């Protein structure tokens, strides 16, 4: 059985009303946001280079992520990487990036400029590569893009995942995720 962390439930609650934003399409399924990564397919295995360094087996390279079909009023996006399986099911925040201009459309692997990096689980303002326990089941890494009506630069530096979600409440226009798996 897969359990959800508190922060994952909070993100779902934040985005729960966003589906109604899509225009009617005459009986066809509505077209919403699309999030992809060239590093892995949805529910695919994440390459080791995106894991943490040292015993974690990687190079601590942040994942590339792209977004399309944003809501019309989107001004900025936030990118979040979390592991709901980590910390004994309480979840781990690996990457908090925000104040990203919506029209940018992507972040490349290991890109660091032109946006604000928030605080990860270790208290650092940086991408933190994956490092699940050796021999543990594959962890699910949820890479989420949230579109908002906030102008790029509107949010202060150093926000944690929870603080960012609180700041986006009432400003989120939609969100979408891609999930990757990683184990050691």
Tell where the protein language model's regions lie, with residue ranges:
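Positively charged n-region of N-terminal signal peptides that target proteins for export
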Residues: 1-4
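Bacterial N-terminal signal peptides
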Residues: 7-17
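N-terminus-centered regions that define maturation/targeting leaders and the start
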Residues: 18-184
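Short hydrophobic/aromatic-rich motifs at helix boundaries and adjacent loops
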Residues: 6-9, 136-138
